[in-house]
Amino acid sequence: MIDLTGRTVMITGASRGIGAEAARIFAKAGANVALVARSADSIANLAGEIGTSAVAIPCDISRYWEVAQAVENCVTAFGGLDILINNAGVIEPIARMDEADPEGWGQVIDINLKGVFHGMRAALPVMENAGGGTILTVSSGAAHGPVEAWSHYCASKAGAAMLTMCLHKEMGDKGIRAMGLSPGTVATQMQREIKASGINPVSQLEWSDHIPADWPAKALLWMCGTEADAFLGEEISLRDEGIRKKVGLV
């Protein structure tokens, strides 16, 4: 396991699923963990589970000032910020474009796309001053192709993937390591919401078809090591058996 003793990671969407598993795994690797999510009770409970190396920071990532404050709180708690994991994301309301609620559609963009930018923008000055850092964004296969009734999700994930590429282009030579992770379908609450919609082929998958949340969490940890430097500015797919072997999943 990669040793992150003395390093600090901030994880958005840390209240459940991939984010919560990443928090546990990064803490086991020795990192200080800043848990960011709207669900204050959930992240407080998780921080209590992890112990003194974790701090809960309630935050709505769709609001930049809250994200900036979260970064400030993280730095106050642990003295810096070495790794940012943009994990928070939503998929509801699932609807075809001719029936989609414009406000709900826009809220997905606010969280999945603007939230990623907000995290990057708030973290970068801290990382630049420290001489570098790592920014990882949880992506999706939906970033690369259309899925029925997911126009909001596909558009937001495509935009977030482009942010990773732009960040690498602008800051890669300044010590900022930027990468995306496309985990495939993961056994989380989001898949329950997709299943309930019954609209597209993804909703027809069985629970056993999805990978456990600790797989992408372990991949995110691996991406913090030098072995992943070959993928800087790119998106890594956990559907790739070669990547699964590198991460130690198979």
Q: What are the roles of these predicted feature ranges?
A:
Residues 15-16:
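Conserved glycine-rich cofactor-binding loop
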Residues 58-69, 102:
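The beta1-alpha1 cofactor-binding region of Rossmann-like NAD(H)/NADP(H)-dependent oxidoreductases
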Residues 95-97, 104-106:
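Substrate-binding pocket helix/loop in short-chain dehydrogenase/reductase
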Residues 145, 166-176:
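Active-site-adjacent segment of SDR/Rossmann-fold oxidoreductases
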Residues 120, 156:
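Active-site helix of classical SDR
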Residues 180-183, 188, 197-246:
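C-terminal helical subdomain
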Residues 140:
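Residue(s) in the substrate-gating loop at a strand-loop-helix junction
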